């Protein structure tokens, strides 16, 4: 048995092993299929990547070609500019050579024409030698300039070669990019087996991070180089400005030197004429005695000495001119260097753009490589999860991966070598920049030396003027001695003296003109300072005016808000009164239908007519009230839009404030610059500086004119705001007229009510007579609480509907009639239970109302305060900005002072508005109080008049109804405020808790109405079932009418007393206000 069991188990094990082997074979086949599919997919991806790389290579070649073309075009343009510049310089130098040759020829001719005296000839030979030396020096300088030109051309060629080298480097970098792409391909192939050796991946990631760090460092270096280039540009601009100023001064000095040279040439001609005349005189005077000849020779020696002094002065002037020519040549060299520096900057910018482009391409390629690596890693992870790898295949793959890693490392070394080459290139560029810095420093030093030489030139120019004055004085002293010379010599000397005097006078005139110009400029500066001070004063005045205007506008806004609140409250109170009167009329019309005599059949028709008329009037009034509410909503929306406009205007005002501050800074800077330049002009006499200050002042005034144009825009905005305010006032007046028409309609409705009451009293008298005749005795009737309750319920319903502003359908009041067939017995226990329920509900509602009332009050107060503050701040800012702009404009238009327009708004109108709003609020409060007091007194009067009824539950119902009414009126008074304060509370945005409370409130009112109708039906059935009752007791309807009349009389007396107090308070101060009050109060008090 054991053997059999062992055999069976062995067979089972063998079967299991065979099954496992089959399953493993199936798995292996599936894995092989998957590997084949993966290899196919990888091959397809590799083909796609090759195609993409080929496309990228083509695009790169195209981009290279385009870049090379652009660079070649730019270089050709630069070469053309350089050629043109060199041609122009060559033309200028040839022109200068021609001028120098002409001057040399003139000087040679003058030397030939000079008479041949022995002492004079030696001196002139010396001068000729000096001049020849000067000419040799000038020719040497010209040759040096030619050599410098050739050097510049060589520098241009060297830089072109450098540009070509840089292009070769760019190509090398592109090749490096291609090698990076090949690396990326190999990386992808390697990462397909990345799960085997994660260490290699980590090494590659570390290398990538190192490359990225190196790229970041290079970017930082590039940014630093850019900043240095910007600094060099600013320095170059400043130096170019200084060079331009020096050019201007040199041109002025050239003009002065040319004028002086012309004068000296004229003097030389005159001197030659004099010498010829003297030679003739000497020939004629051979017969003169030797003593006279000695005197004449002594005088001639003096004259010759004076002329030698003049010749020395002329030589000094020639030296100065030569120095000026040197300065001009130096300036030209500086300009050439500046142009070369600009060219270098342009080349550096091109290189920077190329480097940025290469860097961006590298980053994009690295991102693509990272994405591909991530995808391959995910695929490998999935494959590793699904399949298991054989050790032999793993070893082969590891060997292949090691081989690939070796290749990648070699390529990385090549890349590092390329990075080192790029670093070396960056170092070369840094050296170039340092050289440019050194050149710039040299140029600054040269400019400083040129300035010093210029100052020396100015000092030297002042010296010959003094010598001229001294020579004039010597000539004036020697006049009596020269009287012995013949008349021709005297005339020649007089001519020279007159010429000297004319030159002195011209110099004096020029100096006086310069002094007058300086005085004019100083006066203009002082006037402009005064204008600026006036502008500042006017700005302050306009700010104060703006503040006063904002305060006036705030007071007007507050008064208008109060008027709106009071009018809304009055409209709501009138609506509640109309609804109460309408329901009372319905009840009064339904009651006479109880009578059973045929004479009572006339009553329902009349009551229906009165009810129809009342319903039509009430519907018209409700329609008008809804229109007023819609207008209020529009007003709220317009206020919101105005607030938005005010915010926009505030932003514009802030921007204009910033602009004004900038202009003030510019004005201050210009003032400081003016002072500094005035000092410089006084020290050096530089008129160019003053001209620049005047130009800057003109620029500042142009900016002020632009500000004037900009300030016209806020003026237009202010005008628009004023127009909007006027429109709002007109709309308020229209609404006031509509509200004034409402009391007239109310009085008309009240008249109709009085007529209906008279008819009802007449019919009630008839009913009393018939009842006395039929029954003889009538039981004592308590005043029916159903009517009062229903009237109060209707009032509360109206209050809830007004507060919620939702179009909820009113709950229809059940018509109370005599239902003889429906007799319902109600025990006192049920009544007590109902009363307890209602009391509990009322207490819950009171608690909820108290909590919500507190929340509403706090929210309302906080929101109103925030809105008022924001509005006040906005208006203040706007008015201040507008005032400042107005003051600026007026100050610029009227520099002597402008009369500030005073805001004379009508205070009488404001006081009238406030008075009318106060009177309207007093009237609304009086109506509200008298109405509530009237209902309370009427109910109390009817309760205290002593009906002998055994049941006590109607009094409890009265108390419940009073509580409900009081809470409804509290809700009314609280919910009317936010609607009038300018806050927009539409009906569809009410909270859910408020809607639930309203529903509970309406359900309690409907249940009360049902209960009251039941009690009323029961009472009336008992009255008509009882055959005998007391005789001499009046009907409850007559008592109710008397109570209503008393209430209305009390209202009238209260209103008359209030009116008298207002009349005594006002007196005869405002006749128009009194008339308005009378017109408003007469239709209200007439009842």
From Swiss-Prot:
Disulfide bond entries: none
Main location: Golgi
A single MF term (Gene Ontology): protein kinase A regulatory subunit binding
Biased segments, Basic and acidic residues type: 667-685
The entry's keywords: Coiled coil, Cytoplasm, Cytoskeleton, Golgi apparatus
UniProt region (PKA-RII subunit binding domain), positions on chain: 559-572
One GO term (biological process): signal transduction
Keyword Ubl conjugation: no
Annotated function: Scaffolding protein that assembles several protein kinases and phosphatases on the centrosome and Golgi apparatus. Required to maintain the integrity of the Golgi apparatus. Required for microtubule nucleation at the cis-side of the Golgi apparatus. Required for association of the centrosomes with the poles of the bipolar mitotic spindle during metaphase. In complex with PDE4DIP, recruits CAMSAP2 to the Golgi apparatus and tethers non-centrosomal minus-end microtubules to the Golgi, an important step for polarized cell movement.
Oligomer status and interactors: Interacts with the regulatory region of protein kinase N (PKN), protein phosphatase 2A (PP2A), protein phosphatase 1 (PP1) and the immature non-phosphorylated form of PKC epsilon. Interacts with CIP4 and FNBP1. Interacts with chloride intracellular channel proteins CLIC1, CLIC4 and CLIC5. CSNK1D binding promotes its centrosomal subcellular location. Interacts with GM130/GOLGA2; leading to recruitment to the Golgi apparatus. Interacts with KCNQ1; targets protein kinase A (PKA) catalytic and regulatory subunits and protein phosphatase 1 (PP1), to the heterodimer KCNQ1-KCNE1.
Domain-related comment: RII-binding site, predicted to form an amphipathic helix, could participate in protein-protein interactions with a complementary surface on the R-subunit dimer.
Protein name per its UniProtKB record: A-kinase anchor protein 9
Underlying gene: AKAP9
